[in-house]
Amino acid sequence: MPGPMGGGRRRQMGAKPKVKNPGKILGRILGYTFKNYKIHMIIVFICIIVSVLANVQGTLFIQSLIDDYITPLMNTSSPDFTPLLFAMARVAGFYLLGAASTFAYSKLMVYVTQGTMRNLRIDIFSHMESLPIKFFDTHSHGDIMSVYTNDIDTLRQMISQSMVQLFSSTITIVSVLVSMISISIPLTLLTLVMVAVMFIVSGKIGGKSSKYFTAQQDDLGKVNGYIEEMMNGQKVVKVFNHESKAVEEFNELNDKLFDSAYNANKFANILMPINAQLGNISYVLCAIVGGVLAFNHFAGLTLGGLVAFMTFNKNFSQPINQISMQLNSIIMALAGADRIFKLLDEKPEEDDGYVNLVNAKIVDGKIEPSEERTGVWAWKHTHSEDGATEYRQLKGDLVMDDVDFGYTDDKMVLHNIDLYAKPGQKIAFVGSTGAGKTTITNLINRFYDIQDGKIRYDGININKIKKADLRRSLGIVLQETHLFTDTVMENIRYGRLDATDEEVIAAAKLANADSFIRKLPHGYDTVLTGDGGNLSQGQRQMLAIARAAVANPPALILDEATSSIDTRTEKIVQDGMDKLMKGRTTFVIAHRLSTVRNSDCIIVLEHGRIIEKGTHEQLIEQKGKYYQLYTGKTA
């Protein structure tokens, strides 16, 4: 469905409504649970078995209590209640043991469940951080957030409740069935007939609700994704007066969620009452038939045996009802787990690079590694042939040689890109929106890999450079600056986490940010919230420049860094940028062409191709596309 401005939204996770391989998914869930809590789970299962057997034994002893203690006392003129009291204490002991075991495994399961959820969240987040930029460009952020909230929560409920209940109910059914057979085979057969009816009903209703529970999780993710998208784009929505359109689209998604949730819970909620009524019918039938059998002493059935059997009858139908109830929770949890594991199964960003970036020093004209920050950087290249290590100084020389690129293999967006940036040069990319300016910088960072051609950094194919080291060598200042909920000091320090306070302040001064920072309520200790919403766009960009400055990178990428601020602020920001760019190879993308006049080379792009290249003066003389963009006139 199109977004509020007609474009398609990012695709959602878990697009197919049916969970594939539920057994495999359940196995992975159990694997996560047992991985760190094997001993705890063994104790839990032992406690469950003890609890069930204690309760069954207590119920089974009721037969002896009535037949061997209560009935004889009724025919005695001077009864001695001492044996009865001891027998009652024995029954109470069984039930107390069962209660203690239940308390123990319930408390343990809280610890196991929360620990498993903690580990799972860590694994999800760690894996998410290893994913390529392409994943976040093609998936709804709100849908990803739904994995951390809704899907994790449904899985938590399954592990803490459904899994334990399923095991407990299974043990209860088996032990109760054996006990019922020992009391009366005819009544047991009657009970099993009613149980068979329950299973048939549960299968029919459960089958209908299964697909809707899966769809419910997917639709919930879509609603969350849309809300997140609209919150981020609220200014755009209001500028274009698309509030009613946004509400209309939200209602459409919300209605789909209503339909799937209604259908899922409609079938799920009628399952327990139906099974409860079938259980009541089974109880009444067994009471009538059992009364007749006990009255006639058929097959050795006594009054005590009948009372015990009727208790077991209730205990037998109850776990079956619980299983049918938990099956719906398990189905929902499997749908959530499916989305979780789809995220975990996303392929991490590949990195086959082996050239590292290291601090270096020059000794007798030679490059050597240094343990300290010297301001000199070098590429450490260990040759696989002979194991020799070569150090090559990082100068910022970058070459793109006949590069072709497409976000998909069947549609190229860059064609035959050739450029050469000498160390310390300022290279500017200009062109219409969608011409390919930002795409080129994404290739330099290796956020995406090219289909054809070569990109060399200081003569080294960038595919050979480890991505983390490549990106460490490139400072980035984006138009949309992302600030974290933390102090101004820590937001700047994010550029280099081991930077001292003095280095952070020096970087802020270089970016011309120091003066406005000191006017904030708590200066550098002011906590920014809401992505720095209380700062102006210019102030946010100054912090971005300071963040890049504290990293002290050898090269820079300035992506449309001053296209949305006023002229006065732009001069302040531009002055900070000029200080930052000094002595560094810099790639600039700007809508205000006045900011790139002093570039060493201006590259004009159109439809993914370089159509002009040269200095400002040279391009003005050519009176081509750049001339049109700069002057607004046609040659």
Locate predicted features.
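Membrane-integrated ABC transporters
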Residues: 1-55, 70-91, 105-109, 113, ...
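Hydrophobic alpha-helical transmembrane segments of ABC transporter permease domains
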Residues: 27, 46, 101, 105, ...
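An intracellular "coupling" helix at the cytosolic face of ABC transporter transmembrane type-1 domains
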Residues: 35-38, 133-134, 152-159, 163, ...
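Helix-loop junctions and hydrophobic alpha-helical segments within the transmembrane domains
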Residues: 124, 128, 237, 340, ...
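ABC-type nucleotide-binding domain
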Residues: 77, 360-635
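Helix-loop-helix
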Residues: 72, 179-193, 263, 267-338, ...
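Juxtamembrane helix-loop junctions of ABC transporter transmembrane domains
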Residues: 15-22, 54-70, 85, 93-141, ...
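Transmembrane helices of ABC transporter permease
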Residues: 36, 40-53, 91-94, 161-215, ...
